[in-house]
Amino acid sequence: MVPEAELEQTNAGLVPASAGWFVLNARDARWFHRPGRDSLPLTGCDEFEAETYFRMLGMSLQVLSPGEPNSMYHWETEQEDFLVLFGEALLIVEGQERPLRRWDFVHCPPETRHVFVGAGDGPCVIVAASSRQFQKDGPWGYYTVDEAARRYNACSEEETQDSDVAYAHVPPSQPSRYREGLLPD
């Protein structure tokens, strides 16, 4: 029998504190905020939760303001999949720009270079899922330089595997509580 995980109340919201199954409402969970972008790593962040990090699957909610990227242009060694739940976004994939709207699904096989940028006149909500099966065997991927991504401040200044280098020009995300109105009703 699989036990229920303990949820720990932190200053920024609830986080899983042990292994096991759990139910967690996104509005009660700990988010990470930086200007223009909020994210909820539903399955843990390896740099923050070594004990409860999900080793096989990564999943997050990302809320983007218009013009704000969800990450820096990159590729990963694992498959990644995305679903636009609300609003509009611009996908930059392999140097091409593709507009996205609610319910658009994006599949990125391993090594697909990509980034999302909020679009339209309001926030965009994206659910992101990725395999983590092979990341233990070597590098997770790479931040790459791309002219289309650069136009949206969505790429590193240089090719690198170092996230500190890739994100040097943006403020770091900080743990935060859910902000009212962030998610649609």
Locations of the language-model features?
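Extended, acidic-biased charged interface segments
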Residues: 125-135, 145-146, 168-170, 174, ...
